[in-house]
Amino acid sequence: MKQKVIFVLLNDYSDWEGAFLSTALHVGVVPGSDVKYEVYTAAPTLNEVRSIGGLRTLPDYSFENIPRDYAALVLIGGNSWDSPEAEFVSPLVQEALSKGKIIGAICNASSFLCSHGFLNEVKHTGNGLDQLKQWGGESYTNEAGFIEKQAVSDKNIVTANGVGYLEFTREMLLLLQANSPEVIAGWYDFFKNGYFK
């Protein structure tokens, strides 16, 4: 049976940040490979959310009716992670972590995790240490855990900066064991370097 991966979207979400991951999960890391996951979306309500690029998405779930039988929550970045509606995501993350589920956060969603203390026990990255310190304030006590990389995976949390979407996808695919490490490495090489180097 396929497991659910739920992409958490707020208005003004960055549509490019989750595109590679959702596709690799939905159709398989490579054509014809096993598909272990189903992709779903969640938003504050069941009303559509609109991306920075103007794409409209009708969510599968509101934050109130997210099922509990999922494998991972993927927090897609954008311009609303410091808004009041973002605050409803914090208990979802807390519950997911308490149940050993995987959390992915990219761009400002990483800063959101920082501002709620979720990065204090793990190695992590984001849109720069200065931004994490600004968003985190006194809640951020793990400056030593910050790593200057496009994406970082530690324990059950994957973080990335806003242009680290390929590395974010790679680390999420590895953590989810969506395919073998060799196949995932080949996927990453293809999308990073293209047909011609």
Which residues are covered by each model-predicted region?
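Short gly/ser/thr-rich secondary-structure transition/capping motifs
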Residues: 52-60
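Active-site-adjacent pocket-lining segments in enzyme domains
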Residues: 2-8, 13-14, 20, 27-45, ...
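Lipid deacylating catalytic domains
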Residues: 48
